[in-house]
A protein has these predicted regions:
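Feature captures the catalytic cores and cofactor-binding loops of soluble hydro-lyases/lyases
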Residues: 1-7
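Beta-strand->loop->alpha-helix junctions that form or flank phosphate-binding loops
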Residues: 1, 14, 67, 167-174
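Phosphate-binding loop of NTP-binding sites
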Residues: 6, 12, 17-153, 157-165
Length: 174
């Protein structure tokens, strides 16, 4: 009898973070029917994610970010949980510095971007509220021409992001 061995597959890479991200981007790109909704903001990302996912789950098979898996490690791990059965993904996109949301959007390829608000969160890293707004605006800047930006009308910094996108803009507010 021939003995079968089950050995693990091991990849040697120079940078494990880049390898994780590129694997997640590759996997996401293969799911051509998937629609991704990206959510960012200083506060309210998790509540907004839960609300959107709850509504979408009535008609679609949805994957959503678990907990606060919204950074350069968590978002790729979430993308790698996607299966061909998923029709929608609702993903939080957090940041600590400029360029991070751009990178997350490159990986996830959102068609819809929601910005909840801009507040003095991570001010110690970015230095000014305007820099925080610019970092959050990276989500709407990354949307495709046929995408949709959903912006908080009640936050002037978020509303100003309508000038930063080629996508259709919808607003919400009180």
């Amino acid at each position: 009898a021939i003995k079968q061995w089950t050995l693990p597959v091991i990849f040697r890479v120079d940078d494990s973070l880049i390898a994780l991200q590129e694997l997640a981007r590759w996997w996401r790109s293969r799911l051509t029917d998937l629609r991704v909704i990206g959510i960012t903001g200083s506060v309210g990302k998790s509540s907004t994610k839960e609300l959107i996912a709850s509504v979408l789950e009535r008609d679609f098979v949805v994957l959503k970010s678990e907990g606060n898996l919204n950074n350069e490690i968590g978002l790729p791990l979430t993308l790698l949980q996607l299966e061909p059965k998923h029709q929608r993904a609702v993903l939080e996109m957090g940041m600590y510095a400029r360029g991070e949301i751009t990178r997350l959007a490159e990986l996830a390829q959102p068609i819809v971007g929601v910005v909840t608000n801009v507040g003095p969160v991570h001010l110690e890293r970015l230095g000014a509220i305007e820099a925080i707004a610019a970092a959050k605006a990276e989500l709407v800047q990354a949307l495709p021409l046929d995408g949709t930006a959903i912006l908080n009308y009640d936050d002037p910094r978020v509303l100003a992001m309508r000038e930063a996108t080629r996508a259709r803009v919808l607003t919400y507010g009180l």
